[in-house]
Amino acid sequence: MAEPITLARPYAKAAFEAARDASALQSWSDALVEAAAITRDSKVKALLSSPSLTAVQKAAAFIDLCGDTLNEAQKNFIRVLADNNRLPLFPQVSQLFELYKANQEKAVDVELQTAYDIDDAVLAKLATSLTEKLDRKVSLQTAIDPSLLGGAIIRAGDTVIDGSVRGRLAKLAETMSH
């Protein structure tokens, strides 16, 4: 069976194109994030996997759970997912949608892990440097991980730059063992 992210891709692409064409990227993003959160609830998971409910009933129940925040196109999107038994894929659809949206907006979320706290001036300089290197607007999130020993790990999309002492020691150990 295919991976959930693979199954979600055409739906995320369709949602993104509909949102882009309607100039409603943020509205769709908010709706998909909310739908993904609803889908993660254990009672909702049971409802969505219930064989006694039809696709129409599942869609109606899901739309009710979303409240009044959905527009008609978003409700129709939910109905299409229900018709194809894909409502449980909302977390993956939302994840892919955010990726497409970031590409459209030429933005990227960058995660910076360091062994120690870094001052704001260094973070600003790093963000500027990454913006130039990646040719995208950078949103920098930081996390402290003392197990890195020193240095940093930078994750931007599917790119990882490991400049940590822990990473260098692991490479050295691997080289010495061969």
From Swiss-Prot:
Keywords, ordered alphabetically: ATP synthesis, Cell inner membrane, Cell membrane, CF(1), Hydrogen ion transport, Ion transport, Membrane, Transport
Subcellular location: Cell inner membrane
A single MF term (Gene Ontology): proton-transporting ATP synthase activity, rotational mechanism
Signal peptide: none
The keyword Transcription belongs to this UniProt entry's keyword annotation: no
Membrane topology recorded in Swiss-Prot or TrEMBL: Peripheral membrane protein
One of the record's GO cellular component terms: plasma membrane
Subunit structure and binding partners: F-type ATPases have 2 components, F(1) - the catalytic core - and F(0) - the membrane proton channel. F(1) has five subunits: alpha(3), beta(3), gamma(1), delta(1), epsilon(1). F(0) has three main subunits: a(1), b(2) and c(10-14). The alpha and beta chains form an alternating ring which encloses part of the gamma chain. F(1) is attached to F(0) by a central stalk formed by the gamma and epsilon chains, while a peripheral stalk is formed by the delta and b chains.
Family membership: Belongs to the ATPase delta chain family.
Functional summary from the UniProt entry: F(1)F(0) ATP synthase produces ATP from ADP in the presence of a proton or sodium gradient. F-type ATPases consist of two structural domains, F(1) containing the extramembraneous catalytic core and F(0) containing the membrane proton channel, linked together by a central stalk and a peripheral stalk. During catalysis, ATP synthesis in the catalytic domain of F(1) is coupled via a rotary mechanism of the central stalk subunits to proton translocation.
Protein name: ATP synthase subunit delta
Natural source organism: Teredinibacter turnerae (strain ATCC 39867 / T7901)
